[in-house]
Every structure is written in C-alpha cells, then in structure tokens.
Amino acid sequence: MKQNAKISLIGSGNIGGTLAHLISLRELGDIVLFDVTEGVPQGKALDLMQAGTIAGSDIKIKGTNDYKDIEGSDAIIITAGLPRKPGMSREDLISINTGIMKTVAANVKKYAPDAFVIVITNPLDVMVYVMLKESGLPHNKVIGMAGVLDSSRFNLFLAEEFKVSVNNVNSMVLGGHGDAMVPLARYSTISGVPIPDLIKMGLSSNENIEKIIDRTRNGGGEIVALLKTGSAYYAPAASAIEMLESYLKDKRQILTCAAHLQGEYGVHDLYVGVPIMIGKEGVLRVIELQLTAEEKALFDKSVEGVKKLIETIK
C-alpha cells in the first residue's frame, strides 16, 4: 500500500485550519498541524479528523507544538505570523513576521530540507524571500502564494461583468502581492477570447475593466474592511491547495506564484508574481510573457515596491 504524502502546516489559524480541511477532503496526504499555542493545533486536528469521518476521509491529522513532528515532510505550507492590526505600520509587521519566519526557516532546514515549501504569510514577497535565504533550500522548492489568489479575484469579477461561468474565465495577474499588482487584461480571456477583443465587440468597456482591475488590486483590503476583525482565508487556502496538488501529483500546471527570479523579466534575486510551471521537482520553469511598454512599466513599478520592502530587512 502506497504511503501517503506528509504535509506540514505551520500555523493553525483560519488559513491553517482551512488548509487542513481541504487536504483531508481531497485526501492529498497525512497532515501535521503545527502552532506555538498549546492546545490549538491538537483541538483543531481532533475536530478535523472527526469531520473527515463524515466525509469518508482516512487522512491522519496530528496537532503539535513541536517542530520535530514536521520531520521528513514532503510539502510544507506556512501561514504563521501576525496579521496587520489597526495602528501597526507595514514596517512593524515586517519586523515581527521576519523574526517568526526565521524561526520557521531554521526548523524547516533542520527537519525537512527536502520539502516543497509554500509561503502564505504577509507581507508575502518579503516573507518568502526570508524563507529562501534562511532555510538554504533550493529556489525551485520555495514559492509564495500570491497570483493564484489575485487571479481568482480577477476571474470572479470578470465572470460577473460578462455574466459567464467562472469556468470560462482565465486571467493573469503579475507583480508583487499588494496594491501595485498588475492584472493583465490583454492576457485574460473568456473561453479563449481576449478581454480587449470582447470590449471591441461591445460586451464591456475599458472603464468597466479598469474598475475591475482596481477592485482586484484592493481585493484583500475589501474583505478586511468588511470582516473588521480579520482577513480572507477561504480563497488563500484554496489557492495554496491548487499549488500543492500540482506539486504532489506532478500536474505541471502553469500558475501565477511568487517565484524567485534570476534574470527573468529583468529581475534579479527577488520574489515576484509570475506564471510558473509546478511539477514534482517544484518550479519546473518560469514563463516569461512579452509585455507592452505600458505593462512593463507597471510591472517594474510593482517590482520596485517589492525591492523597497526587502531593503527594510537587510
């Protein structure tokens, strides 16, 4: 009988718990749910295993406060870190979460150096960079969850605008995971037809698409403003699962993720959202799109924002 993959989730908050539930339902592998708060991962693991019995899932879930339990993990998803609170500057958040990420990275290096690592913790582009540098893992095995989520938001808003199924929509969002992200209408399609062509047919307008692009950029902020006490977790978790499944099943899907660039798009030693192919070796290749001068200018501005954030931790 084939042994299940071992998947460790670092952080047992809303995203961590949702990840565990989705992994269990899809039976992607056995789960280690880690958190520094005693009782929380153990309680959630028990609750999730009991939910699994109803769904017919035989996946094992272990809650723990001991990093040693992640030993030999095939894949690790990291959500540990503080959310940004009212009155907290971006710099404060970077400082606190960098400290947390360094601790996580040291333990990943010690116990699971062969794992494929997906980082979700914000500020994403900085945290995934810290994970790479502190863990010493190869760059093709460390990626950040960003573009899949941003594209899912863009997809939804486009589906609503054109009154079609989300299954008909494919969109592309590049750049940093923040306000300066670059949703690309030219590379986004409805059943293979590019958005600019649909505008020419009179099915939408440039003004409407620009509004959708702005709403996509503020997608996370819109949810934070509505929830008041937290941030999105269902869609971020579902996005990470898409990436995880492509790795575990060698699906070779092309997904937009924060990837470590080494000259692609003219970017060196930074994590930026670009389309990549994910398979059993991790990142198999970076897909380099041909950008117009205007798109490249927006992309470069987004990269500059990431660069400035990285400078704050050096």
Swiss-Prot record:
Any one of the GO BP annotations: tricarboxylic acid cycle
Active site: 177
EC number: 1.1.1.37
Binding sites annotated in the UniProt record for substrate: 84, 90, 122, 153
Listed Gene3D superfamilies: Lactate dehydrogenase/glycoside hydrolase, family 4, C-terminal, NAD(P)-binding Rossmann-like Domain
SUPFAM superfamilies: LDH C-terminal domain-like (SSF56327), NAD(P)-binding Rossmann-fold domains (SSF51735)
Enzymatic reactions: (S)-malate + NAD(+) = oxaloacetate + NADH + H(+)
Binding site for NAD(+): 11-16, 35, 97, 120-122
Record key words, sorted: NAD, Oxidoreductase, Tricarboxylic acid cycle
GO molecular function: L-lactate dehydrogenase activity; L-malate dehydrogenase (NAD+) activity
NCBIfam families, sorted: MalateDH_bact, PRK06223.1
PANTHER family reported in the protein's UniProt record: L-2-HYDROXYCARBOXYLATE DEHYDROGENASE (NAD(P)(+)), L-LACTATE DEHYDROGENASE
Family: Belongs to the LDH/MDH superfamily. MDH type 3 family.
Matching HAMAP family: Malate_dehydrog_3
Function according to Swiss-Prot or TrEMBL: Catalyzes the reversible oxidation of malate to oxaloacetate.
Name of the protein this chain belongs to: Malate dehydrogenase
